[in-house]
Design a protein with these regions (language model features):
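Residues at the start of alpha-helices and the adjacent loop-to-helix junctions
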Residues: 12-14, 27, 74
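Residue-level detector of intrinsically disordered terminal segments
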Residues: 4, 24-26, 73
Length: 191
């Protein structure tokens, strides 16, 4: 059943997260929400938010975990893992895993595992959302236009208790692609 669309202004943030001895990649488009609008808090498919950022705007006390998201470019609400603690929250996970990443536009693995097992040994097996799903989360925003760039986070030690992070903009990228080793244009890296 198709959910009716709602209009909302959009604030965009690019994110990439690596969790639990893995490198994880995430990105999202973040529509601004009115503080009084609690109807789209992401707690159910009927209350799907347009982004993890909207979830955090509606509920500033939101914790990291699974939330329902739905943008005008998506055919139905879906659950995604939202990091609501890093830099004020609002980050959506689009990939995670330890080894075995693919550069396929179709992604890899069971997308439900991103929000069900974002960390720990269960997160070793790679899961990457399809490029179409990531583009739908961005809701028409190009990766190159994400003001915060891309955030990659990976476990620094085998126990997953210390983390290493790098951030960079992804330049001249009109649509999401997992083809990271090809001729990609990256901005400056910060650690």
């Amino acid at each position: 059943m198709k959910k009716p669309m709602r209009t909302t202004s959009h604030k965009t943030r690019w994110a990439s997260i690596a969790l639990a001895l893995s490198t994880v990649l995430t990105m999202s488009s973040f529509p601004a929400a009115s503080a009084a609008d609690t109807s789209h808090d992401g707690t159910s498919s009927d209350k799907a938010a347009a982004s993890c950022y909207e979830v955090k705007q509606v509920n500033p006390n939101a914790k990291s975990g699974a939330y329902w998201l739905y943008t005008p470019q998506m055919s139905a609400p879906q659950q995604f893992y939202c990091d609501q603690e890093t830099d004020g929250g609002g980050w959506v996970m689009v990939g995670r895993g330890r080894e075995g990443w693919t550069e396929s536009y179709g992604g890899v693995g069971n997308a439900d595992q991103l929000h069900k097992n974002p960390t720990g040994s269960a997160a070793f097996k790679p899961v990457q959302l399809s490029s179409n799903t990531v583009d739908a989360l961005l809701n028409g925003t190009k990766p190159q236009d994400l003001p915060d760039g891309m955030r990659l986070r990976r476990a620094y030690d085998p126990s997953g208790t210390q983390w290493q992070e790098v951030r960079t903009p992804r330049l001249q990228t009109a649509q999401w692609s997992w083809a990271m080793s090809y001729a990609q244009h990256w901005g400056p890296f910060t650690f």
